[in-house]
Amino acid sequence: MKYYTALTIAGSDSCGGAGIQADIKTMSALGVYASSAITAITVQNTKGVYGIQNVEPEIVKGQIEAVMDDIHPDAIKIGMVNDCDTIRAITETLKKYEDQFQHLVIDPVMVSTSGCRLMQEDALDVFIHDLLPLATLLTPNIPEAEILAGIKIQNVEDIKSAASAISKLGCRYVLIKGGHFGGNEKIDYLFEDGKLITSYRGMNIETRNTHGTGCTLSSAITSYLTREMDMNTAIAMAKTYLSGAILAGKNVKIGEGHGPVNHFFEPKALFFK
């Protein structure tokens, strides 16, 4: 007997709403045993990011190896990776274990909710050419998709063009999150090999508590993939979970800025294989 297990590789958020903390909360709430490898320590709260200390690449590599050699996670999620050396270390390490995990979900964290840049400019090319081709699924929002595709996105046709360009970089599935368009309805678009296969509609929930929503969604998708669901089902269920978490925490005041979602609005016990 064994739990379903996942590994998150990301930065630490001292206020607990995003990053590694949000990933572990999400995976735990969805009944998946979470392990972690920390890439950076951030100094932040709900109002902003005030400092970033990268973890030495050898330590990042060691954390991943320790988990892979012992826990054998079913799926992996990658969030904040800030510099070239860390990205190379992660890529080289994961390539050694490619036959051990089925899915790699990458959330290309580039800018925080408060507007702080979280990926060094010179790291983008290394991220695109080294790490991105290993991904099963990439989950960019509109600004991140614009950076990765090198185009401005103003409508759905632009989203399709961006997804086509991103898919050519080597990632099979691309989920472009349309939340940054505004309006009463939020639509995310899923592409497979550059072709639109489905979209996910959700209501716009009025709240300041949006800190860590991208981390939460990608971790939820990873959790459902860990539990052997197909990509479409995993994303649909993750979207439902995120909406529930936002709704459950929309009126709660944590801090003076963008507060967190309520990850534990409907927690599950750990699932067994």
Predicted regions and their residues:
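Conserved phosphate/ATP/ADP-binding segment of small-molecule kinases
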Residues: 121-197
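Charged C-terminal helix
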Residues: 54, 233-273
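Short pre-catalytic strand/loop immediately N-terminal to key active-site residues, enriched for Gly-Thr
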Residues: 9-15, 197-211
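Conserved N-terminal subdomain of the carbohydrate kinase-like
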Residues: 2-8, 28-106, 110-113, 264-267
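Short, small-residue alpha-helix embedded
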Residues: 146-147, 207-231
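Phosphate-handling active-site elements
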Residues: 31-35, 196-198, 224-238
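N-terminal basic/disordered segments at the start of proteins
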Residues: 16-32
